[in-house]
Amino acid sequence: KNDKYKQVEEFLRLLVPTLNAAIEAGQISKPSKDKPLSIVDLGCGHAYLTFAAHQYLRSIGMSVHVTGIDVRPASRDRNNEIAAKLGITDTITFKAEEIASTTANRSDVAIALHACDTATDDAIAWAVNGGAKLLLIAPCCHHDIQKQMEQSPEPWGAITKFGVMKERMGDLLTDALRAQILRIVGYRVEIIEFIGGEH
């Protein structure tokens, strides 16, 4: 649990200045009470990031509406119950839906913290198709490409026969392709180490 808090804290440390820069550059409208900043957290799980982003942005005076999407009805119910206890259901909502087919409205910002495997790709596709101006995505595991690398032709076999090297190669390939696709459709992309491997 402590690792998750460190990840959320680091994510917020990156979100706020990036968001402020996008607002100052006119890429995202300055949030107001009538038109709050819209954020969708894709693959939110227990919504640590969803609640933290909501509460932190509100604490610095930013009008915001946050929607959390997770496939599990139990997560939706738990998160909506917490929102009700906090009295914030007018500015935060949760839905139990697949990311690829969510009914969530378009958003200014799409975030995803460790949406597993191809759920990260679903989050990117949803954000791009919905016209999100800012995406902050911290990918998780890359199992889909790992399976496809089982029978790697030479010279790749020299790398993929070792588990840790195969995993790293899969991570690099997947994230490089994601970044290239985002660049092709018009996004400026930065790839950074989000938080050290020990977390």
Residue ranges and their predicted role:
Residues 1-29:
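S-adenosyl-L-methionine
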Residues 9, 13, 71-199:
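Class I S-adenosyl-L-methionine
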Residues 15, 19-26, 54-58, 83, ...:
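Structural motif corresponding to the C-terminal cap of alpha-helices
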Residues 25-36, 60-63, 89:
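Short helix-terminating capping/connector loops at secondary-structure junctions
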Residues 34-45:
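Conserved class I S-adenosyl-L-methionine
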Residues 43-46, 141-143:
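Short glycine-enriched loops at secondary-structure junctions
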Residues 46-61:
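Conserved SAM-binding loop of SAM-dependent methyltransferases across substrates and taxa
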Residues 65-70:
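Conserved SAM-binding motif I beta-strand of class I
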